[in-house]
Amino acid sequence: MRGILSIQSHVAYGHAGNSSAVFPMQRMGFEVWPIHTVQFSNHTQYQEGWTGRAFSADDISELVRGLNNIGALEKCQAVLTGYQGSAEQCLAVEETVTKVKQANPDALYVCDPVMGAPDKGCIVAPGIAENLLNRLMPMADVIVPNQFELSQFAEMEIHTLDDAIIACQRALAKGPKVVLVKHLYCLSDESFNMLLATQEGTYLAKRPHFEFAKAPVGAGDLISAIFTAGLLKGWTPKQAFQHCHDACYGVLNATYQAGEWELQTIAAQQEFVEPSKHFPLEEVTLKTVE
């Protein structure tokens, strides 16, 4: 039985981390093997707080060892990683990706390098950002950063579309074959912007921006998951990006229309198979400097 190994956070209530990523990949036709870095009652934006615990790096390694014992790693089509709770967990992920690629050289590694955002800065524990930037992102086949995380990896500030394109080129030169910027903040506030960069070209995706009373948590995890599943279907990065962008819009639209804070992942599940709206991609290039 082939499948996707997804190593990220988990919430019992709502959709964030694995709770946002696992079902969409299953709905797109893939077996998913989730390993949780933390397990919380709910996401951490609730005023009432949350309960739960973080798992150790050894907990992750132990589960991977068990999967290896039954021959599962050679059937692993991709490793998808998101939020990591400690620097040691990052090292366990590095070891896991190495083991999976030894067992199946065709396996993809998709890294969502959760670090922070421009308005919040770096929000992760000490050592995590360094391990993401120096270990996990360079070894990934695909990275799915936001604008802040891309700027950290490319070691440059991003204020314009040209800056973003240059940053993506710098990122591609460090190892990854595909860069999907899941939120490009520096462009118009009137639209939500995402960017895809490969050696073949760079594409901008724009969709209407929703004015949520409280922004849903877990949309980035959803983007990474749908894109991973699209690539494993044999689609080109451009095709997977188009599908991912349209499907994510559909889920967010359903969430907005329902007046909900938590993503309406189950109610809008048809979006993962057949998105209801289509927003054509725009190929973009660096403006010629006179």
From Swiss-Prot:
Pfam families xrefs: Phos_pyr_kin
Protein's name in the database: Pyridoxal kinase PdxY
EC number, as in UniProt: 2.7.1.35
Function noted in UniProt: Pyridoxal kinase involved in the salvage pathway of pyridoxal 5'-phosphate (PLP). Catalyzes the phosphorylation of pyridoxal to PLP.
UniProt enzyme class: transferase
CC per GO annotation: cytosol
Keyword terms, alphabetized: ATP-binding, Kinase, Magnesium, Nucleotide-binding, Transferase
Entry annotated with the keyword ATP-binding: yes
